[in-house]
């Protein structure tokens, strides 16, 4: 969010990067108030698991009011009211970045009232009459599709980018071939070895090759190629699913390890990682 944040001058961070050559570079650089929310940190830091959403709103509201003490706030103290007061009185919009927006959906799947409260908060922020008056942009990362209740999506005004439908931003999902070759030349690494380990994605209609950026940068630091991703917490969850051997998952994986393709239908997956009805949903 350093690119958008108006509280600093970020030219030194971006002037020598490719983005500086874009026509809109100066248009958005350091032009907005920014809010970064890490939903996982709110979950782990909550004093009461049933008040995660309330505590998140209270903490963010407190921070905003502390940052803008001269703003006249209304008697309605919702987060949206506070943001609207700042945006209208200061004449500057917000850019909000929400990391792992779906963490609560995954961690509290057995608490429907808490989840509905969370979705209603997001709806109030991003699907209301004042949304465009407050936000210049909102970016949310997550594993699951936008959560729905009933037949209506809570946030159907968002554009979703996924591994299956990444266009036109697929080249930003990781390191491209060109970027990886530049790193290999700079740090004296074997490109072919990195390609063997980490170019596991071909995205979009152009089948753009994408390298895992975390793994590549770890090799830049250590000089050693190996499966770094398997040491992450996320892999533990995947391993548990594999060990269940649901609907022949183990056999399908063994087939893929011997270079045999396995067909997977990804379009049927909903938005609940705790409800797996088929091998296709598990792989997705």
Q: Predicted regions: what is each one?
A:
Residues 1-284:
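Phosphate-binding site recognition
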